[in-house]
């Protein structure tokens, strides 16, 4: 990453500092291990920033490892999208991309070792019976009738599993630990199951696949990971993580540390719920700009630096909490306010005619791209007799608090002249169709010579030179702060989470690059859509408003 960011402090970094000071480790090696069965979301970004950020700050290494032990739900599309997202966020992994499937041969050998030590057995209970025998939080489990098979018998049966002689669900390999443990994860967990599925990396070489808890710790150890960082739901699994490594012949024994996952208001993070949104066509896809996926946020106009800043601000703790959506919006708003060039766009246009400006004349005005950054340069904007302004920027009559255009009153056009509304035309329904004005030609870049005060400023686009555009006005996807807690979360979808309107932009925006953010003056921050926008048919997505539109709602 290019910018120098202050090193954050949290309990995990304090552990690392102590490990280095005590000589427990001489270097730091972390990993980010997603399963390639879906698209990354903002919650994954927290883990990415933590793991890659630690490696970066301690001059260590961070592996990108795909936890690919479930071939039926995984594919290369997800592998490529995850690599793209990590790179886009500004991080590079150490060496080649790793896959848990790289270690399938070693994992099989370690399973054999556990069998030889009498610590694993082939069970022929059905999956339903295994669940039944496991017990509950208040009742201990009971032993499988196959638990006391001999080592020789288990070795032979495990080889038959590998040879494809058992059907799916007919046999599995289980660890022999403690069926009375207060931790259900330690009640003889399944280590291998039969799956006749082709794998995106290993093809049809295997018909048995290792479970996550068996694979994860061994993969960490084989890669020399020093600090295995995961979210709190794996806290109990740490006991199995340590048990596996304690009972196999492997030189490295990483330690697992847990932190709270990201819970964000007005959205859902569950892969199942996100998939439901897509499959039921409640959104347009995984990269819908209303989705919390990295690809959705990117399409909406979020920047990598804003997402990294968000992850930095929320911090890393063991405390579960719900983060306000406005915290995420604040990060992108701050980023774009600092870095986005300004431009003018009219989203709800009404025509304005300057009667004392010569017809057919085009005056080229020079406007700054950023009010506080002269190094960002200027742009040329055409000014003509007929303009578009926002419908809400005109009233026939108004009180003194209204600082925009009023019939018989004056206002300044952004970067241009002072105008006065003289008269209007309406259609048969009483809607204003045209506002006729006069302009003061001596007010370009200066106040009226006679000293009269003109306080209001409104934006505009040339009606003759402006370019038509579609604007997609995105809001929060749900109407309640915690939609995941609803009986039917889909019923809490915000019907106004996407509103499409037609308007006009200044001609310089014809060449707007997808995902590149602009501040449309007085309207918000927008970017050209990375799928649907073209110079022939411009489409702009609203990234975020100039201020929090939900603040007042939340207070009520």
Curated annotation (Swiss-Prot):
Uppermost EC category: ligase
EC number(s) stated in the UniProt entry for this protein: 6.1.1.18
Motif ('KMSKS' region): 268-272
GO MF, one annotated term: glutamine-tRNA ligase activity
Keywords: Aminoacyl-tRNA synthetase, ATP-binding, Cytoplasm, Ligase, Nucleotide-binding, Protein biosynthesis
Localisation per UniProt entry: Cytoplasm
Gene Ontology process terms (BP): glutaminyl-tRNA aminoacylation; glutamyl-tRNA aminoacylation
Domain of life: Bacteria
Signal sequence segment: none
Annotated positions binding L-glutamine: 67, 212
Binding site for ATP: 35-37, 41-47, 231, 261-262, 269-271
Pfam families: tRNA-synt_1c (PF00749), tRNA-synt_1c_C (PF03950), tRNA-synt_1c_C2 (PF20974)
SUPFAM superfamilies, A to Z: Nucleotidylyl transferase, Ribosomal protein L25-like
Cellular component per GO, a single term: cytosol
Catalytically driven reaction(s): tRNA(Gln) + L-glutamine + ATP = L-glutaminyl-tRNA(Gln) + AMP + diphosphate
Placement of sequence motif 'HIGH' region: 34-44
Assembly notes: Monomer.
UniProt family annotation: Belongs to the class-I aminoacyl-tRNA synthetase family.
Protein name, entry field: Glutamine--tRNA ligase
């Amino acid at each position: 990453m290019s910018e120098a960011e202050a090193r954050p402090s949290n309990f995990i970094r304090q552990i690392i500092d102590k490990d280095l000071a005590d000589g427990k480790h001489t270097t730091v090696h972390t990993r980010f291990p997603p399963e390639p069965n879906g698209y990354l979301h903002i919650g994954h970004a927290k883990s990415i920033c933590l793991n890659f950020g630690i490696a970066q700050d301690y001059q260590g290494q961070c592996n990108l490892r795909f936890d690919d032990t479930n071939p039926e739900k995984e594919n290369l599309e997800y592998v490529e999208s995850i690599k793209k997202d990590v790179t886009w966020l500004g991080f590079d992994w150490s060496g080649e991309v790793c896959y848990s499937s790289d270690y399938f041969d070693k994992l099989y050998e370690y399973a054999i070792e556990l069998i030889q030590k009498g610590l694993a057995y082939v069970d022929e209970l059905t999956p339903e019976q295994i669940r039944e025998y496991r017990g509950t939080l208040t009742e201990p489990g009971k032993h499988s009738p196959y638990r006391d098979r001999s080592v020789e018998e288990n070795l032979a049966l495990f080889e038959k599993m590998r040879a494809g002689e058992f059907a799916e669900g007919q046999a599995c390999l289980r660890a022999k630990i403690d069926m009375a443990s207060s931790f259900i994860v330690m009640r003889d967990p399944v280590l291998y199951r039969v799956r006749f599925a082709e794998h995106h990396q290993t093809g049809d070489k295997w018909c048995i696949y290792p479970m996550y808890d068996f694979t994860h710790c061994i993969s960490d150890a084989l890669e020399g990971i020093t600090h295995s960082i995961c979210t709190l739901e794996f806290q109990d699994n740490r006991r199995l993580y340590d048990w596996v490594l304690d009972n196999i012949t492997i030189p490295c024994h990483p330690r697992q540390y847990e932190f709270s996952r990201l819970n964000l208001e007005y959205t859902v993070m569950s892969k199942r719920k996100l998939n439901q949104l897509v499959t039921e066509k409640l959104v347009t896809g995984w990269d819908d700009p209303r989705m919390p996926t990295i690809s959705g946020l990117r399409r909406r106009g979020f920047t990598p630096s804003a997402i990294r800043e968000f992850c930095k601000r929320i911090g890393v703790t063991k405390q579960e909490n719900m983060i306000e959506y406005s915290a995420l919006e604040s990060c992108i708003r701050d980023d774009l306010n600092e870095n986005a060039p300004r431009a003018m766009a009219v989203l709800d246009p009404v025509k304005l005619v300057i009667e004392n400006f010569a017809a057919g004349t085009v005056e080229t005005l020079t406007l700054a791209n950023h009010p506080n950054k002269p190094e960002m340069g200027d742009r040329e904007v055409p000014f003509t007799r007929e303009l578009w302004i926002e419908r809400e920027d005109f009233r026939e009559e108004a009180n003194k608090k209204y600082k925009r255009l009023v019939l018989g009153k004056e206002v300044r056009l952004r970067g241009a002249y002072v105008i006065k509304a003289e008269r209007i035309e309406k259609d048969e329904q009483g809607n204003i169709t045209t506002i006729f004005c006069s302009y003061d030609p001596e007010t370009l870049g200066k106040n009226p010579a006679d000293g009269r005060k003109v306080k209001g400023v409104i934006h505009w686009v040339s009606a003759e030179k402006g370019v038509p555009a579609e604007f997609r006005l995105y809001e929060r996807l749900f109407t309640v702060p915690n939609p995941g807690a609803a009986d039917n979360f889909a019923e809490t979808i915000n019907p106004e989470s996407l509103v499409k309107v037609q308007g006009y932009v200044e001609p310089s925006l014809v060449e707007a690059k997808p995902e590149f953010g602009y501040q449309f003056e007085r309207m918000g921050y927008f970017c050209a859509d990375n799928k649907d926008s073209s110079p022939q048919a411009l489409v702009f997505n609203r990234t975020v408003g100039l201020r929090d539109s939900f603040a007042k709602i939340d207070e009520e």
